Amino acid sequence: GRGGPSNYVRL
């Protein structure tokens, strides 16, 4: 995903 690790989990 975009923005960082927390957003990457949500994809």
UniProtKB/Swiss-Prot annotation:
Q: Please list the residues that carry the modification Leucine amide.
A: L11
Organism this protein belongs to? Praedatophasma maraisi
Summary of the function given for this chain in its UniProt record: FMRFamides and FMRFamide-like peptides are neuropeptides.
Q: What is this protein called?
A: Extended FMRFamide-9
Quick check: keyword Secreted in the entry?
yes
Record's signal peptide = none
Which domain of life does the protein's organism represent? Eukaryota
Q: Which family does it belong to?
A: Belongs to the FARP (FMRF amide related peptide) family.
GO CC annotation = extracellular region
Q: Which UniProt keywords apply?
A: Amidation, Neuropeptide, Secreted
Q: Spell out the subcellular localization from the entry.
A: Secreted
GO BP: neuropeptide signaling pathway
